[in-house]
Amino acid sequence: VGGAAAGGRRFGKGDWLRDGFGVWYKRRVRAVFFGTPEIAVPSLDALVGIADVVGVICQPDRPAGRGLELKAPPVKRRALELGLPVVQPVKVRTPDFAAWVKEREADVAVVIAYGRILPKGVLEAPRLGCMNLHASILPRYRGAAPITWAVVRGEEETGVSLMQMDEGMDTGPVFAIRCIPIGADETADELAVRVAALAAEVVREDLPRAVRGELAATAQDHAAATMAPLLEKKDGRVPWEKAAREVHDHVRGMTSWPGAFTSADGKMLKVLATKVAAAEGAGAAPGTVVAADRAGVRVACGAGEVAILRAQLEGRKALGAAELVAGRALRPGMVLGS
């Protein structure tokens, strides 16, 4: 489009704007943003830089802390700092909410980690529909917890997929995918920070191209899809019967929710950090503490051993390996998880 309209007339400085999408408009691209947790905040910041954000939708405030006081989600807090209008619908499958979204007259909705499946009426409300930033290399790890499950399953790479949303669970066609490696000892929390930055990069660089029609949306290979289901507390239980590498991946993947845990002397033990001490070999029964010194508490697995570097016994503060050994919280011969 450049600086001239059809027919050769130059766009007047006062009546046309060139927005962050690189397109000349009589107004900037209008966008609504759906997101709730911390991982979505950098994408909101990126979107504000390239479009007029005419509405921010996040989940309701939730009770948190010992006092169970209502706490606003990170996206709400950031949106209010930016002076953006925020709504927190209890239900999204209502005609009133779909009407509210439509009344924003948005060109596009940008969604990242909102936490709910949007109905057809909402998906179709913006002119170009809803575009989702999903934290995986689709079609792998569709679902609510892609970062956690990618780490737990020992993946060496993940990414962010920009997709056109449909009524399914992360099943829509994909505009672009950006990838990053996963460190061998990287936790899910650490990875989430890098994924958040990558998603913001997608917003700044790939979203504008999708809006301009420069990126074709490619259908996913549904036969190759894998799932990343919503996490439950029970998912954190350490599977000592698995190989040492898998146990280590489980611990680093389950941070910080639901947290990796086992039992010791009948009390819950949160396993906060580990390393692979021996990748192979089988000796003691899985879960048996085979050695305990300042370097770590070595625990037998189905194959090999892991060293617990940091843990927290029920009712006590988190301790490093040296403190765990000195206080005899973990001792050779103990069987964890029994």
Predicted regions and their residues:
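Extreme N-terminal basic, low-complexity initiation segments
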Residues: G2-G12
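N-terminal Rossmann-like dinucleotide-binding module
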Residues: R28-G67
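Internal alpha/beta domain cores that form substrate/cofactor-binding pockets in large enzymes
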Residues: R30, V54-G55, P85-R104, I117-L133
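A residue-level signal for conserved active-site and pocket-lining positions in enzyme catalytic cores
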Residues: G35, V56, A79, A109, ...
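Donor/substrate-binding cores of folate-linked one-carbon enzymes
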Residues: G49, V108-M227
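N-terminal glycine-/serine-/threonine-rich beta1-alpha1-beta2 phosphate-ribose binding loop
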Residues: Q59, P63-D107
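An anion-binding loop in the catalytic cleft
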Residues: D235, E241-S338
